Amino acid sequence: MPTCPAALDTHRVRAVVPSDVLRGRVAWSPLKSLWFTSMALAAVIGGLATFTWAAFGVFLASTAFVLLFGHSLGSHRKLIHDSFQTPKWLEYALVYSGVQVGLAGPLGLLRQHELRDYAQRLPDCHDYLRHGSSFWRDAWWQLHCELRLEREPAIHIESRIAGDRFYRFLERTWMLQQFPPALLLFAVGGWSFVFWGTCARVTACVFGHWLIGYFAHNHGGMHHVVDGAAVQGRNIPLTSLLTMGESWHNNHHAFPGSARLGLYAGEWDPGWWMLLVLRKLGLIWSIRLPEDLAMRPELRALDGAEPASAALGSPRFADAWRLLANAHQDGIHCEGPATLLSAELLHRLLGAGFTHRPAARRLSVTAAGVQLAGLPALCIALAARSGAAKLLAILVLPLAFAAEQIRQGLRYG
């Protein structure tokens, strides 16, 4: 029988005995299964029959919006972990966007999260709660089934959430909340926009949530291990942009209350970038980071990596543009670690203009008294390769520089 770690004494989940979350069976959930299946069929059949590039653009934009503002900021970092403070109207808007992901209502999603979190911290964990079965069985379980425990533990949700009338309304009507945006999409673009902007969006979000969850608990790198926990989170670098930073799951298991998930050099975290923008606008405050959390004696570092801290300067865009314009003549050279892109791929992209230095914090370029890091550095080094590469770099540099300025200039603390 698993014992309850001291760290769980203040957890929202209160089981009579910890083994309560081990004893249960996985059963088909008709409503859950019908919800996902109907959305998926409508997305595939209706989406293919009415495809337009405009509708596909609506799908991409709406999916990115609800994942960033809804799931990552609203549901996860705010509602579940309360890792920053914001005006109530903005909190409501973010959480409402989270409902548009199509996973559950706000209270149901919080309960699901807390049960998994509690169970995964114990020395043993049910396969359903740990994504511990085979790939296809886990897909069936998570997308079409539910875990029915023999004795359900009590889950204590703070009255500010559980007693909130708006959240209780969303909990009762979360499936119906797809209708308002669907009606708007229909008015603008007809059935094509509905199939792509609603059905395909919900299907992609729900399926993607399971898929990332499966890999983030079974495969991927780790900076930390939680001793005594049955399940360790894993970092999935290649999906950091798609998930708005949520795929840095090992970091999240280590510091669950942190508003920042991409904690180390090269770990892109769009959710964090947006929090910095909102903070600059005065819309959020009291941001929690790892150093603000209580010490966890069970948390153990596995490598010597240090959280990203000091930025490599803040050059003006004019300086970056000047380097790009003269990149071929100046013989620009780029060096740094291969974090998101492999060293082999960087060598193919940049040729002799790249030196792999695993100990470096980030990719960097230094020339003519200007130092650039990250994506701008990659753009400048790429521009030195050929005319076509330079044209691509010209198109990408403004976005790369803007992202870098958000990362450096708006960095909390």
Map each language-model feature to its residues.
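Non-catalytic, topology-defining segments of multipass membrane proteins
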Residues: M1-W210, S258-G413
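Glycine/small-residue-rich hydrophobic helix-like segments
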Residues: G213-W268
